[in-house]
Amino acid sequence: MAVGYVDCHCHMTAEEFSQDTEEVIEESKENGIQALISVTEHGGEFEKLIYLSDRYPDYIMPCFGIHPIQSNGDGQRSVTIKDLEPVLAQFDKYKDSLVAIGEIGLDFTPWLAPTSEQREEQMKVFQMQLEMAKRMDLPVNVHSRSAGRQTVSFLKEQGAEKVLLHNFAGRPSAAQEGVQAGYFFSFPPAVIRNEQRKKLIKMIPLENICLETDSPSLGPKKEDRNVPSNIRLSCEYIASVKGLMPERVREVTTLNALRLFPKVSCKLQK
């Protein structure tokens, strides 16, 4: 039996999927995807994600997390403790259903988190969620935009072991530090339009790479909605950069995902 894909980071509760969730999931299955690991950005998505994972058991694999950047009306702002505290009980309520904690991390984009106070609060929110993951023995699904080195260093300081650095765009030296710590890195279909990622992908061993789409964002065309079935584009691009067959990349990245997310592995073996 051929090994299918695992999309290690997508957003199935996004508004962009609200009208055709079933069609998107069927298309994913038809394109050989074994599991969708779906993350959240804020507490308002938690119940919706549990509903979806109950509706599509052993296919949509839920992760709870509070993202470092939050929506603020029609804009965006840096996360605060107040975004996390009211939903802490939800993590415990659904801990048996969760396969990871995410999307969590740091985002030091200058116009979103310009002050040291904002960045310190992001780190506190990140730390609290890392501690929760450790207590629940769950991996973490991590965001690190404009903070690659700081994120890897902080993860190591906190003793995080099961880590996916999604859509990593930090320096190769920071990636190397993550590889040495045993962390995994995933890349969405948008890498096909970003030459700068080629160096990173070439440097990171295949044994430390997973596949993701970050759907509905980061697709092959910036203006189009991304969908999980585009995962093959990530796979084919990584294969071309590394001079490997796509089948080999699919097989190894799926095995990596099942090692990193043991609860996903258990669900797929039912």
UniProtKB/Swiss-Prot annotation:
InterPro entries: Metal_Hydrolase (IPR032466), TatD-like (IPR001130). Zn(2+) 2 binds at E103, H143, H166. Zn(2+) 1 binds at H9, H11, E103, D214. Disulfide bonds: none annotated. Its cofactor is Mn(2+); Ca(2+); Mg(2+); Zn(2+). One of its GO terms (cellular component) is nucleus. PANTHER family: DEOXYRIBONUCLEASE TATDN3-RELATED, HYDROLASE OF PHP SUPERFAMILY-RELATED PROTEIN. Exhibits 3'-exonuclease activities and apurinic/apyrimidinic (AP) endonuclease (in vitro). Show preferential AP endonuclease activity on double-stranded DNA substrates and 3'- exonuclease activity on single-stranded DNA. Belongs to the metallo-dependent hydrolases superfamily. TatD-type hydrolase family. This is Putative deoxyribonuclease tatdn3-A. It comes from Xenopus laevis (African clawed frog). The gene is tatdn3-a.
